[in-house]
């Protein structure tokens, strides 16, 4: 239910030091593989090439995704208790309720990405006006930064 999702979000404590990281790795349960692309798109929209957002299931993670380590990468386990990947102090694990479905995972993941955004410069807001000017020329139609 929406109220249960909201309660889960409210009790999720995100670290206050996310601004020191320039890479984030979200591990989602295999059964929610279809939400990965949504999170990757949100990272691309908000941070472009400045902050790396990687999103994989635990099964995908097992296939050499973490060979190259970085002290500036933060790992987020959604419904996966990560005790292996990244430094211990660079991890957040969020337990999902047994009844969690795609809506719960989508809402929680977007909330956490929003918390990451709060602690970094507002790249999207600072660039959206110039972007819409460029794309308006490309599409030969006026595209506004704010959807009305």
Task: Describe the residue ranges of each PLM region.
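A SIS-like phosphosugar-recognition module
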Residues: 1-148
